[in-house]
From Swiss-Prot:
Oligomeric and partner information: Component of the biogenesis of lysosome-related organelles complex-1 (BLOC-1) composed at least of blos-1, blos-2, blos-4, dsbn-1, glo-2, mutd-1 and snpn-1.
Protein name as it appears in the record: Biogenesis of lysosome-related organelles complex 1 subunit 5
GO biological process terms, semicolon-separated: endosomal transport; positive regulation of gut granule assembly
Its biological purpose: Component of the biogenesis of lysosome-related organelles complex-1 (BLOC-1) involved in gut granule biogenesis.
Pfam families documented for this protein: Muted (PF14942)
Name of the encoding gene: mutd-1
Originating organism: Caenorhabditis elegans
Transmembrane segments: none
Similarity comment: Belongs to the BLOC1S5 family.
Source organism phylogeny: Eukaryota, Metazoa, Ecdysozoa, Nematoda, Chromadorea
Length: 131
């Protein structure tokens, strides 16, 4: 088992410094700050601060004046216009094209069946006429 004097010799501390962690904590803080700056986390932190300031400013801005000037109505109209445009983009256009295509195929098939039926009738007439 290690004695206090042997521990003091190993870690090169005086007896009073064994429980004083100031140097160790200071070194950890310095290492954290150095890594923080090297990884440019301070820029991200600054961005967060700016965003929070913008939120505070926007929450403190009086909106009654915007309503009185008609800007909110205009903005609402613009949002509604954009919403309508987005909704038309969401509606599948291929469905209409596909329905038109199927209708055309149906008409063409009906015409073909009618032509085949007409030819069959003509053959039957010609066969009965030759008998």
């Amino acid at each position: 088992m290690a004695t206090i004097p042997s521990v003091v010799r190993e870690i090169t501390l005086v007896g009073e410094q064994i429980f004083d962690h100031t140097q160790v904590v200071r070194a950890e803080i310095d290492r954290f700050v150095e890594r923080f700056e090297r990884n440019e986390r301070h820029r991200e932190f600054d961005g967060i601060l700016r965003a929070s300031h913008a939120l505070v400013e926007s929450s403190e801005t009086p909106v009654e004046g915007l309503f009185d000037m008609g800007k909110m109505e205009h903005m609402t109209q613009c949002v509604d216009d954009i919403t309508k445009k987005l909704q038309t983009l969401v509606e599948p256009k291929y469905q209409k094209e596909h329905d038109v295509y199927l209708e055309k195929v149906k008409e063409d098939q009906k015409k073909y069946v009618d032509v085949c039926r007409e030819q069959a009738m003509n053959k039957m007439r010609s066969m009965t006429a030759h008998r």
